[in-house]
């Protein structure tokens, strides 16, 4: 992944970088539980290889996005995640979902397959 691709992806308010990988070639996208925040994944960057960027999903209605209306339908959330991760298609992308986040990750994988997009390298 180029730094430009990562910078483009991070322009989306849905994504937050956790730490900063040196010349990342892969990314892990953390999907928090219902009511959770990207803080759940703080410290995890130290557990990943140096070439893997940790990203976390920032749900609307939480933290810095407190004034943003929450999603009412899973399909709307999935659409936003697909848009946010479009710049990351040239790299290995892993989705890690906690509780409801796992369901979100599964729905994202299904929609990527339905659209013929490159599937994530892993879903946990």
Model-derived segments and spans:
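Domain-scale detector for complete catalytic domains at protein termini or as standalone homologs
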Residues: 1-124
